[in-house]
Amino acid sequence: MRRWFSKLGSTSLASTSRVTAFSSSESAAVEQLADSSIPPPITPFIIAKPDIHWNVDFASDPCSWESCFDAHWEAAEKLLENEEEISYEKVITVFQHLNCTVQLLMMEANAQPESAIGSILDRHFTHQIMERVVDWAIAAPHFLTPTCQVNMIGLYEVIVGESHTQNHCLLVHKPMLLPLLKLLDWCRKSAEKRNFTPSNTDRHFVLLLNQICTKLAEDTTLLHFFFDFDDDCDEQFLVFSLLIPYLYDSGEVGQLARDALLLILSVSRRLKRVATFIAVKSNFCPVVATGLSGCFSQLSRSFGSMLYVSDSWHKINADDIDSYSSLLDFHSSLIFCNAVIQVAHGYVVSQVIRYVYHGFLLPVVLPSLLQGGQDELISSTAYYHLCLDSVTETVLVQTIVKLLLNESCESNKTVLDVIVERISAGNRLSQVSLSLVRTLIDLRCEDIMFDLVFKYLLPCTFLQPNQTLHLKNQMYVRTAAQTLLTFVPECTYKSSALCSQETLHIYLSECRNYVQETTDACCEKWVWSYDGRSPFFMPKINSDEESATNSNGAFVRHSSVRSSMASARNGLNRYFVSRNAHITADSLRQHTPPPELGEQESSSRSSFPYDIADSSLVLDDEGDELIIPALTPTSLMMMTSSSDYFQFAYGELSETDTEAINPSVVSMSGAPAQSISDKASLASTSANCDTDIEMARSFVLRGWGQIEDTDTFMALMDRVPASKIKHSLEENMALIDSRIQYLEELKAEAKLQDLESDGFKSDTNNDNDDEDPAPLGKPIECFGNQGVGPFLESIMRSLENMLDNSLYVTLQTTSVLAALASYPQPLIAHYLFDQRMLLQPNVKNLFKVMDSLKTQIDAYASSLDGFDVLLERGIKFLRSRAERYEKVVESSRRLRSSESFSRNGNMEGRSSSRGLFNRFRSSNNKRLYPSNDSSHPHEFRIYTHKAIESRDVTLDHARAKQFVFAAIILSQFCQELAATVLQHSTVVPRPKVSPAKDYLRREVNSAGKDANCCAD
């Protein structure tokens, strides 16, 4: 913690006593100062503290201002010109007079309606007051440096802070600006000499810089005076550079520095030159990442030893942050980093993201998540969870999540896989890991859900043969809801607090909102619908032997956090995937849009656009011909690595279209004839195709790269037959959107490349310049014969062990399952709820697990005397915990709302109101039980009048509590799942209207109005 003292600086006791003694002699008047001689050094003369006699007459008489100014400046000038040794008392006297002159100057400046040079300001310029004072202060003895700096800074604080005229800042004048820059440089050199150890000048210095930055944000024209647009200048932006060392200071100094830096960053968003300086020439970006690492290293490796955590603790909350200073500093640094991403220029953002990932997440956070004992892993997971909870900007969330998806440990598993493995432990580590996974699921990110769930469900190997036909409808909804309600334990029927129409209606309302949010997010941002047809599952072909022995190969897609979280102009267009995809007939023809994701491809809608034997494709002048060669093993590998695009290229190919395809390959003129081995390869490829459709899919249009002149290209395009297919307005609108998004991506990438090329030329010391801040993804292989994957298996296993797990692990497990149930994708929805689908014997069925739990709970309840009493006490206990949990959540909300940086509204899914204990809160938000009840509200005792008589029950009270809690949770969980599955059939996606569609609709409406006017 930096310390600062009074505005006059720290003084010794002796000097203070001298000031007191001299100040007591007030017989000398200001008028006598001109006639008085400079006292000898032994008995220095100190005048009384000068003051301005404020009254109505003085305030309304500018002439009196000038005379008062002249008197004070004359007194100060005599002391400045005195060649005697500068003492502390002399310094104080000089600055007392100067403070009066500055106040008079600001009175004059604020009294003028327009920017003009008044008489007092003219006197400042004529006498070069500020420059002379700065030079005099710099020449003072070293022990007086802090005092001189604090007082000089105080003068400029008045000049900058009390300037109330928006169009007239006195800093635009060189007699004011140049001494200020000299003062700032002097303060910086002093701080460097003491290695930036805390000093009493820090607060005043940073406050002045903050005031200057505020003026720069209000009037960007001032940048011409503080920012040197000459790239060869050493001190291009002194004010910004001076703030960086104070970025992570504790207390008010650090907060003032961070606020000032954010103001400059917001200005740089509109000025490319300033942004380039910040990103390349300054050390701001690495300092941001280094500060995060430093704050993280100060955190305790064992959170339990740092703070008391209860059994229900699973993540860091607002109370935890307020209770520990190092945790508060780390949280503040995360909030600042998020604010930087929010307000800064795109080039600065890319640099900050690069340094945060390579300078903080990789070297600091990643090892902590994978190494250490259980306490260390619990703390590291909670800290990582805090990072995810604290940030809201999409690109920063992507970067944090990327650590889980892209980085691997020694066993070649991703970090996310390692966290999933910890779920089934049933201890505090699994509780914290489950909480993190729940937050990840609430992000509604396609790449996260693909890694957790869908890459294991896509091959459909968890189903018995011929079961995928059930994925086409939602006929299971009503039956599933009714069945889920039958799993409510019968021992809870008598409790109106657990089972009633009112409770079910509350769940229906809450689940509708939650399912609607999930559906909208998936519809707006996700690429695939995961309905068994989109994306098209295709085996990975490496060789004939592998294809013969491994029927369920690897499904490979390009995974990218950007694909589901980063939004374009109106969110990611689901028709446009990547401009790096293979060139297809549709993409060249640009007439037929791709099929709607999840639609059944109609064979009558399209036809294969090219006939290889068509003579119209032969160029008459050179005899060259555009060929469609057979798919080679190399191109097969390319296809399997981008099978998403392969589906788009041939998804609409009908069986009748394949009859027109001639698989013969014609050699191009001037090229060697195709060898027999190539023909054999073609025959081998054809032999591996079971149907004509697969044979047609084994061709891809190539040859455009050999066309080098425009005339040949245009002649070839003229020979392309026009499409006879007509599309609806909605299809054309979607295609227009994809083209617009494509052009915008090209423009954005070109602009970013220009910025990077300009910046990196001058940044020769950066070793990571050739790396992207967040790579777009890596190939992810999806293998069959793995059931439903380790995540779903762990969750099902944890649910199955409900009667053995702790209360809070059970709450986390059911919370994660409820979040998964809100996803509308058919693969996950049918797996969880469709009883018609026959699963493989080794795959756990949700309904069977819940039926088994109900049976065990009812059997135990019927064998235990007084179970109804225990049930009521269990409800009371959970209600009290729910109220405490709501208070914690409300405290966290207040903390977020009190932050000085605005939150991103696109992350609504992360702040879901469906908390762990929300199932047990009262419907009218009041306690169901009076506070003066005989039992403590935070204890759950099973001793009743019957329990006292039965020693068997008292010896097994822990087991009884386990079953009581399980009965309560299962009753609520069944109703919640039933409400969720019912909403799957009623919720309709609400995608955003794209600007292109909105523009065309306005054009159509205006045309219709014009037609009506003409008709009238």
UniProtKB/Swiss-Prot annotation:
<dbReference type="InterPro" id="IPR045668">
    <property type="entry name" value="FHIP_KELAA_motif"/>
</dbReference>
<dbReference type="InterPro" id="IPR045669">
    <property type="entry name" value="FHIP_C"/>
</dbReference>
<protein>
    <recommendedName>
        <fullName>FHIP family protein Bm1_18400</fullName>
    </recommendedName>
</protein>
<comment type="similarity">
    <text>Belongs to the FHIP family.</text>
</comment>
<feature type="region of interest" description="Disordered">
    <location>
        <begin position="757"/>
        <end position="778"/>
    </location>
</feature>
<dbReference type="Pfam" id="PF19311">
    <property type="entry name" value="KELAA"/>
</dbReference>
<dbReference type="Pfam" id="PF10257">
    <property type="entry name" value="RAI16-like"/>
</dbReference>
<feature type="region of interest" description="Disordered">
    <location>
        <begin position="586"/>
        <end position="608"/>
    </location>
</feature>
<dbReference type="InterPro" id="IPR019384">
    <property type="entry name" value="FHIP"/>
</dbReference>
<dbReference type="Pfam" id="PF19314">
    <property type="entry name" value="DUF5917"/>
</dbReference>
